[in-house]
């Protein structure tokens, strides 16, 4: 499920089709539609809400915080939206709810062949350098070790 599907589940719905509003194509479309409409609101993946160069919200977008404890205010421990790094650290620490946050997986039909297993190894090792700059939460070393051990050809 994508960002819109997770958002509708957070709001208590079941399917993306329940969302009403202007249809747009993909994450860049959501960001641009909101930027162009002073009353626009959208839900988007982190990599399209924060500027990759500065880590700050993209010009023309405001990141609206969630009152996760339901007390009617954004308390200090809920105010982690200033930069992409602050936000992803809060997600990693479990301060941002699931959904709308979600775990992403790599899957194959059946056991991965040697080429795919090598790709998974790269993702779990050298590829990890690209995770945080792209706006994702890095895996813990324990999760990486567990996944590597499960790959075919691992000792």
Region locations from a protein language model:
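Exported/periplasmic ABC-transporter solute-binding proteins
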Residues: 1-155
């Amino acid at each position: 499920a994508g960002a819109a599907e997770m958002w509708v589940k957070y709001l208590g719905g079941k399917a993306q089709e329940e969302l009403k509003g202007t249809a747009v194509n993909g994450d860049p479309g959501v960001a641009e539609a909101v930027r162009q409409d002073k009353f626009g609101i959208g839900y988007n993946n982190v990599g399209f809400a924060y500027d990759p160069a500065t880590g700050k919200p993209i010009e023309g977008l405001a990141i609206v915080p969630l009152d996760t404890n339901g007390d009617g205010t954004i308390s200090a421990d809920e105010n982690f939206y200033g930069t992409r790094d602050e936000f992803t650290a809060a997600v990693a620490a479990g301060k941002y709810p699931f959904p709308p946050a979600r775990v992403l997986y790599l899957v194959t039909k059946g056991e991965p062949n040697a080429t795919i297993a090598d790709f998974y190894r790269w993702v779990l090792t050298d590829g990890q350098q690209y995770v945080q700059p792209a706006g994702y939460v890095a895996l813990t070393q324990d999760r990486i070790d567990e996944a590597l051990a499960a790959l075919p050809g691992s000792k």
